[in-house]
């Protein structure tokens, strides 16, 4: 197959949905029927091929997106299986960025669930064409038609029904193909590998005709010639219908809806046919956005094998046998083992060593890969998620991915000194794999703080640290970093004297402390500082060599404020006068005097406690708005704005961080899991006096 031609035969797809809708089971069946897997893996037995981490097989949920390659008809399908739990939406986001199309799996009983809405919005953001598979049609309470209505109501989507179920619940035995107008029935005893076509059952004829008419009404709008033919009463051929469904799917004019039961092995082969027939190849996507490094100009790059090499790294994974693996999606050109390329984001060269095609966690070495391929590279040194790898002579940076800020943090400390070094290595490796996981050190407590997207996210990180890196750690409760400041100008004149035989100590300082916002002639470079020091000594009242001692003393002592021992910020100290002794004065004496002046003077400045305020954004369906706003108000939140976005509402509020612990769980229960939120640090603000009293009492 020529390389140019090959692009038409590739489908890069994701399978995404709410937790438990049956994504992983659907993927397992696809691998089985395309011949990649000789035994079907069942999720509830902990044997699914795609769920290859220990934690996944125990919990029966997918945490990392496993990538695998299979063939159907004459097409190559690269599948990314993505997690459905809200704490792992970053994995979904990464996958969607590099996919050309997606299959959204819905639970036939539950319909459109909360995480389905989140994933759908993420797919909208990256303009990913998609089709819908209503799964679990064999389950008690499954209702295909209700699911179709929910697609319209909850997602604002335009569903195009191309199949109807034959039989319901335990009597579900097949589908009606509305393109061919035939029933497709599966033999139970053949594990779904055998199925046959027959005429539509008599009791379903009318329903099939009704939905066939709806299908034709929607697709003929995309082609004037076919519309004329249809309106004049001529038959529209199956090939014409398929061509128009493909056109409408790629342009997101509508979303084809199919049905089946992956667990009962029904409906998977027609789903594969639809992936090949209707979802785009890299050529259909045509271009990718990016920036030319030499000119700095934004431009569109054609997806083509003949163009210079450009690829996006979308996932880092630690493989126990190969080491660090970097998953890349190649957008243009080709690479071979041994080639040197450049990471244009970091401006570092990388040599391509082993190149692997992945099948869940089995691997196959390849020597060459080209546009449209998704491969894993072993041994890259500097490349992280979101980086571009490019041809050295024609350098480009592809559109970067955006990652949400972590919303929950915990302190961790190693149980023993042996764990100390291992913990540092483990956390840095895990952070390289997952951009939504951050590690920092709290300079006040010296503790290591880990931050993530939710409690399950951090629980799994700690679990992986224990299993993969053999690190035992103690986990602390989340903490808030309070600060202190003064609210009015105060002045202190302090003399430090010490005589106890031998050389004495003497230093006198007169200092004015003032809140930064009240300083009239503040220099621009000082406006964002927490502490500003200035000396206005004239005529040598304090010799020049002693003045740094005053600044050092103030800088050290301000780390423990006068209310509850939190760092003092947003103030200016001006040294206006002082006195010294020829023999007994020293830098140390002036440092001690400055510290004592701070302790005595600051309480006169009406000090106040400050707390971090977060900007919180909640995206919620309309019906939960009242409860969510009421809850934010009860958390001392101030609503900033409320705006519609699609068929959801976006509420922005400023809320103290101390009130946000446990909010993930509250929001889930208030909205039945349908709302989502993100938060970023906004500013420090005064703590109300009654809350400040409680904080002081705890110190």
UniProtKB/Swiss-Prot annotation:
Keywords: Cytoplasm, Elongation factor, GTP-binding, Nucleotide-binding, Protein biosynthesis. Residues 8-283 form the tr-type G domain. GTP binds at residues 17-24, 81-85, 135-138. This is Elongation factor G. Belongs to the TRAFAC class translation factor GTPase superfamily. Classic translation factor GTPase family. EF-G/EF-2 subfamily. Catalyzes the GTP-dependent ribosomal translocation step during translation elongation. During this step, the ribosome changes from the pre-translocational (PRE) to the post-translocational (POST) state as the newly formed A-site-bound peptidyl-tRNA and P-site-bound deacylated tRNA move to the P and E sites, respectively. Catalyzes the coordinated movement of the two tRNA molecules, the mRNA and conformational changes in the ribosome. One of its GO terms (molecular function) is GTPase activity. Gene3D superfamilies: 3.30.230.10, 3.30.70.240, Elongation Factor G (Translational Gtpase), domain 3 (3.30.70.870), P-loop containing nucleotide triphosphate hydrolases (3.40.50.300), Translation factors (2.40.30.10). One of its GO terms (biological process) is ribosome disassembly. It is found in: Cytoplasm. Pfam families: EF-G_D2, EFG_C, EFG_III, EFG_IV, GTP_EFTU. NCBIfam families: EF-G, PRK12740.1-5, small_GTP.
């Amino acid at each position: 197959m020529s390389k140019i031609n090959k692009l038409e035969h590739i489908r890069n797809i994701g399978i995404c949905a709410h937790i438990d809708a049956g994504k992983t089971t659907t993927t397992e069946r696809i691998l089985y029927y395309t011949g990649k897997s000789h035994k079907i893996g069942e999720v509830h037995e902990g044997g699914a091929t795609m769920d290859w981490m220990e934690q996944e097989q125990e919990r029966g949920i997918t945490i990392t997106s496993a990538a695998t390659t299979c063939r159907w008809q004459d097409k190559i399908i690269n599948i990314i299986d993505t997690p459905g739990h809200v704490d792992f939406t970053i994995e979904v986001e990464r996958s969607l960025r590099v996919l050309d199309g997606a299959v959204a799996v819905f639970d036939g009983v539950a319909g459109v669930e909360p995480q389905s809405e989140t994933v759908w919005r993420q797919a909208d953001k990256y303009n990913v064409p998609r089709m819908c598979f209503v799964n679990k049609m064999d389950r008690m309470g499954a209702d295909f038609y209700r699911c179709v209505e929910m697609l319209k109501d909850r997602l604002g989507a335009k569903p195009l029904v191309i199949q109807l179920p034959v039989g319901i619940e335990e009597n579900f035995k097949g589908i009606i193909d509305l393109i061919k107008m035939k029933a497709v029935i599966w033999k139970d005893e053949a594990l779904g590998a055998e199925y046959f076509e027959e005429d539509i059952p008599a009791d379903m004829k009318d329903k099939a005709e009704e939905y066939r008419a709806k299908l034709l009404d929607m697709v003929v709008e995309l082609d004037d010639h076919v519309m004329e033919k249809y309106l004049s009463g001529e038959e529209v051929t199956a090939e014409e219908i398929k061509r128009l469904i493909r056109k409408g799917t790629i342009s997101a004019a509508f979303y084809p809806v199919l049905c089946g039961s992956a667990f009962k092995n029904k409906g998977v082969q027609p789903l594969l046919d639809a992936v090949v027939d209707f979802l785009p190849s890299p050529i259909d996507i045509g271009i990718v956005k990016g920036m030319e490094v030499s000119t700095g100009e934004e431009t569109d790059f054609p997806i083509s094998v003949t163009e210079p090499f450009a690829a996006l790294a979308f996932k880092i994974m630690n493989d126990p046998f190969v080491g660090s693996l970097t998953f890349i999606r190649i957008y243009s050109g080709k690479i071979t083992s041994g080639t040197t390329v450049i990471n244009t984001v970091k401006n570092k060269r990388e040599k391509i060593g082993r190149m692997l095609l992945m099948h869940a966690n089995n691997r196959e070495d390849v020597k060459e890969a080209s546009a449209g391929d998704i491969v894993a590279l072993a041994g890259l040194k500097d490349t992280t998620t979101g980086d571009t790898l490019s041809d050295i002579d024609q350098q480009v940076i592809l559109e970067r991915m955006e990652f949400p800020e972590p919303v929950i943090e915990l302190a961790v400390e190693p149980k023993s000194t042996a764990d100390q070094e291992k913990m540092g290595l483990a956390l840095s490796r895990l952070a390289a794999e997952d951009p939504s996981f951050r590690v920092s050190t709290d300079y006040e407590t010296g503790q290591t703080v880990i931050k993530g997207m939710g409690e399950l996210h951090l629980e799994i990180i700690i679990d992986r640290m224990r299993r993969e890196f053999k690190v035992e750690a103690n986990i602390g409760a989340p903490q808030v970093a309070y600060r202190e400041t003064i609210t009015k100008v105060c002045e202190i004149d302090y003399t430090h004297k010490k005589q106890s035989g031998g050389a004495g100590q003497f230093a006198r300082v007169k200092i004015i402390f003032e809140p930064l916002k009240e300083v009239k002639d503040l220099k621009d470079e000082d406006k964002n500082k927490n502490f500003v020091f200035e000396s206005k000594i004239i005529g040598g009242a304090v010799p020049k060599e002693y003045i740094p001692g005053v600044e050092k003393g103030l800088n050290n002592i301000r780390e423990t404020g006068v209310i509850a021992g939190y760092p003092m910020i947003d103030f200016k100290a001006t040294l206006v006068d002082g006195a010294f002794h020829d023999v007994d004065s020293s830098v140390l004496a002036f440092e001690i005097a400055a510290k004592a002046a701070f302790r005595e003077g600051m309480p006169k400045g009406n000090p106040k406690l400050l707390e971090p305020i977060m900007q919180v954004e909640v995206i919620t369906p309309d019906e939960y708005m009242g409860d969510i706003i009421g809850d934010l108000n009860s958390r001392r939140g101030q609503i900033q704005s409320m705006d519609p976005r699609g068929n959801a509402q976006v509420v922005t509020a400023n809320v103290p961080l101390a009130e946000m612990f446990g909010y993930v769980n509250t929001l889930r229960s208030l909205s039945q899991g349908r709302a989502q939120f993100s938060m970023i640090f906004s500013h420090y603000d005064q703590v109300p006096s009654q809350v400040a009293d409680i904080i002081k009492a705890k110190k």
